[in-house]
Amino acid sequence: MTETSDLPAFGAPDATGTQHRLHRGSAEAVVVGLAGALRRYRVAGVDLTEPYGPDVVPPAANGIQMSPWPNRVAGARWILDGVEQRLDVTEPARGHASHGLLRNTHFVTETFSAHAVTLRGEIHPQHGWPFRLTHRVTYELEADGGLTVTAEVQNHTDATVPVAVGAHPFLRIGDVPTAELSLRVPADAWIRTGEDLIPVETLPVDGTELDFRRGRAVGEAALDVCLTGLTPDADGRHRQTLLAADGRAVTLWTDHAFAYTHVFVTDRLPGRDTALAVEPLTAPADALNSGEGLHRLAPHARWSVQWGLTPHVPDHPHEEDRA
């Protein structure tokens, strides 16, 4: 593939496409063309997301953008205006369509600077999806070392389109094993699923091992659960924090559109016994069928949502401290 010649780039394109390296103070991020994914984010030399190489497809969907739906569509089928739509099956083991239509899409670079990059991915009409959309994502490093991610969906059709979005970051604190970290998610409820991982009912977290409201150790739990009923802070944002015993932490924040957080622990990331994904979602699994959390995007309209990461790394200098 050919990289945009008038834009700086980092590394070879390889499997993940164009590499964009952002830096600000002691913070750095690498954003790639494939799936508009966040390949690495670290502050003061401490990795706060699970990194992977430029020459591999994102393992376990690490860091990808998910649109026009996150998680699964049951049986890869949904109903639009009384007509069954049949999506391509992308999770053969269960027969579902998983994580939207951008996982294998190479995003085009729209703007690129030292601090920020905006990428554009196109969703064309295809099996089970009759709409044309544009999905833009902007990653921007802030002066305090935080990372802000803005996703925008644009409707190019004359129809109202049901959409939902999400992201799939795996969080970490340097080399601390995942089992030794603590996670806080201010969620009052969890979504019970069947063996096919499709939602069955929403239940309170009270008295369960899924109550992360005051924080609890990740431990050896086999987590794969969607949490909801999120309590916002005074500024209206939802915040989930991963914390190490030495005080280092990373907080994932979202705006009000992200009413769901999917917590997923896997042993499928190379070099890690286990890894923890904390996925911000605007809708849960199978939203195209249930309607839960779906945004109805008006003809030719745009919809923008935002989330980000805040580092808590002792002795991390802010950009203004360097002035």
Regions found by a protein language model. Name each.
Residues 1-25:
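Short, Gly/Pro- and small/polar-rich lid/capping loops
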Residues 2-8, 170-255:
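Active-site/ligand-binding surface loops and adjacent short beta/alpha elements
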Residues 14, 88-143:
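Extended, loop-rich substrate-binding clefts of extracytoplasmic carbohydrate-active enzymes
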Residues 27, 96-110, 218-290:
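Acidic/His-leaning functional-site neighborhoods
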Residues 28-84, 89-91:
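Acidic-aromatic substrate-binding/catalytic surfaces of carbohydrate-active enzymes
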Residues 78-87, 151, 296-313:
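Short Pro-Gly-centered flexible turn/kink motifs
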Residues 123-174:
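Acidic, contiguous internal or C-terminal segments within carbohydrate-active enzymes
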Residues 136-138, 292-297:
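Beta-strand-rich interaction surfaces with strong enrichment in secreted/lumenal proteins
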